[in-house]
């Protein structure tokens, strides 16, 4: 069950419950104005920024009555979802509620269908008590109380669970039991996708792009939390501090636009493209483009790049998990090295086999890139083998099963 996000979705919602690939699917129709206020203003422009630590506190947030109106829309969407679940769910069913968009559903379902057992899973990081103060007090407390109405709340890492509990404690909200269930790729599905003709064609293009040079790769949405600009600046610092890498390494960035209704995202895209141009103007030669940026959403090419990297840079400011950090090692056949932000949830699983960096430290990131590029083959192979094992340890199936298990009377 999901909210209808577009006019075609709303037309589909009018058909009621549908059968899609053997699944019963229902789209819940919420009017466009209400949905936009809830999704764009509350979720994308506020909750996402709070949980990822993205606000520039000198200027934002600055809440007024417009946020209050948007929060009422957020509440309305959650009520609509609760009403729909109440009508569809069998007696005593387990309801798995996903992410920060729907933190209030269980609170409303408790009155409508007390027989249902609701489990919430947060895919993002969870902010700490200081970060939560960047929301209006009433909204923050209502959100926590809504999460507290679940029989359990799940997170990708223990540190996000601990932050949630700390927020509840500070505001006098009783936290439900929490559990940790890291999501992972499906290795078989990933391998099947990588074996497609489109990926084979893209692999030839990646080989030509590298031109015999070492290859640093990143695959991301153009999203402030992904820290793309600092990654580019760290690459510039690598070329400054270690001139032996000039004309010997190419940074291939497969980055695609996201949430361009938000001014921060439009500005960040401009900053990314201008930084790419700056690095290339500074170091490029007639025969070498230091940074090759592909701004299209090209999944086959992204898979091909993940199969070919010598170094994979994943340096988010904060990330609930980051699946690319797991997909890369599973796809890569070069014993590629992973340079990974300590603030990615995946670092809690992969950190021993990756080169972990502070995402704000350009010098440390540049040094990690140099270390990765100069690492001897036995260490590369050892780390790559460990990464493959760790990345495959959790699958979509184990993640799903953990949520269902958390709904059982003995809990997580």
Language-model region placement:
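Catalytic cores of carbohydrate-active enzymes across secretory and cytosolic contexts
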Residues: 1-412
């Amino acid at each position: 069950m999901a909210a209808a996000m577009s006019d075609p979705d709303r037309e589909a919602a009018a058909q009621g419950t549908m059968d899609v690939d053997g699944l019963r699917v229902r789209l819940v129709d919420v009017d466009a104005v209400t949905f936009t206020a809830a999704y764009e203003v509350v979720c994308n422009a506020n909750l996402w920024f709070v949980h990822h630590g993205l606000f520039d506190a000198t200027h934002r947030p600055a809440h007024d009555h417009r946020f209050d109106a948007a929060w009422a829309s957020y509440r309305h969407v959650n009520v609509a979802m609760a009403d729909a679940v109440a009508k569809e769910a069998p007696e005593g069913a387990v309801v798995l509620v996903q992410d920060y968009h729907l933190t209030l559903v269980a609170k409303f379902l408790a009155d409508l269908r007390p027989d249902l057992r609701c489990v919430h899973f947060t895919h993002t990081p969870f902010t700490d008590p200081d970060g939560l103060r960047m929301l209006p007090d009433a909204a923050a407390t209502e959100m926590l109380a809504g999460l507290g109405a679940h029989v359990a709340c799940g997170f990708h890492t223990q540190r996000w669970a601990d932050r949630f509990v700390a927020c509840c404690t500070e505001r006098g909200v009783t936290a439900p039991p929490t559990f940790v269930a890291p999501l992972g790729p499906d290795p078989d599905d990933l391998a099947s996708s990588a074996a497609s003709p489109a990926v084979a064609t893209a692999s030839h293009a990646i080989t030509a792009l590298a031109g015999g040079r070492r290859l640093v790769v990143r695959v991301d949405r153009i999203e402030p939390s992904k820290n793309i600009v600092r990654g580019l600046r760290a690459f510039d610092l690598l070329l400054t501090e270690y001139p032996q890498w000039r004309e010997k390494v190419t940074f291939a960035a497969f980055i695609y636009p996201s949430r361009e209704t938000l001014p921060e995202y439009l500005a960040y895209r401009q900053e990314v493209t201008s930084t790419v141009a700056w690095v290339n103007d500074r170091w490029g030669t007639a025969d070498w483009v230091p940074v090759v940026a592909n701004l299209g959403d090209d999944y086959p090419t992204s898979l091909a790049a993940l199969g070919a990297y010598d170094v994979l840079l994943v340096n988010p400011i904060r990330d609930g998990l980051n699946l690319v950090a797991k997909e890369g090692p599973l796809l890569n056949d070069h014993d590629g090295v992973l340079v990974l932000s300590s603030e990615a949830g995946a670092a809690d699983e992969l950190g021993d086999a990756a080169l972990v960096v502070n995402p704000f430290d350009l010098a440390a990131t540049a040094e990690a890139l140099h270390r990765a590029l100069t690492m001897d083959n036995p260490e590369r192979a050892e780390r790559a083998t460990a990464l493959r094992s760790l990345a495959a340890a959790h699958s979509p199936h184990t993640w799903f099963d953990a949520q269902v298990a958390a709904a059982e009377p003995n809990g997580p």
